[in-house]
A protein has these predicted regions:
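Nucleotidyltransferase catalytic core that binds NTPs
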Residues: 1-173
């Protein structure tokens, strides 16, 4: 099932595929509807304690600003973008075994996995905001923070980096 849904994302038939910790494929609308979201982007090759520590610290800080009911409903997503998967494969193809290993490792740790076609931060924020009106938190490492300011992510926008940040923060992020 996971490889079939990965192929849907690869083919451009859907923007994202989501896998619950138990391996079940789920529609993002079902899993995210009106729920606060914490998103960690990365390649997760391999999954490291640093990833888990970043999520733990973010969850603590993020949930301190939520109402008690929302704290219980918070969804933690570990997102692997198609850019990461295609970049790491040979000749622009995805290594399906490596993908399954990463997904299995994250799911064994109780994490929900999201595979998306949204390389730009503002696009993933817009995608997630379709499904929730609750707060969305994106966990950034120093490397990703630096990446956020690169022109390549806003070159297709008339307003450049300023428009990119405007789109990113227009949702409750």
């Amino acid at each position: 099932n996971r490889l079939c849904h990965l192929q849907l994302v690869t083919s451009g038939l859907t923007d994202a595929a989501m896998f619950l910790p138990d391996g079940e494929v789920v529609q993002p609308a079902e899993a995210l509807y009106k729920r606060p979201i914490i998103l960690l982007r990365g390649s997760f090759d391999p999954v490291m304690n640093l990833h888990l520590d970043m999520l733990k610290q973010t969850r603590t800080l993020f949930q301190s600003s939520l109402e008690s009911q929302q704290k219980q409903e918070t969804v933690e997503l570990c997102e692997i973008s198609m850019n990461n998967l295609l970049r790491e494969g040979k000749s622009g193809e995805i290594d399906h075994l490596a993908f399954l290993d990463r997904a299995n490792a994250l799911q064994a740790l109780g994490k929900t996995v999201l595979v998306s076609r949204c390389p730009e931060f503002h696009r993933i924020a817009t995608y997630l905001s379709r499904y929730t009106s609750s707060p969305i938190g994106i966990v950034l490492s120093i490397g990703l923070l630096n990446e956020l300011f690169k022109e390549k992510w806003s070159e297709n926008l008339a307003g450049g980096i300023l428009e990119s940040f405007g789109r990113l923060f227009k949702h409750e992020l």
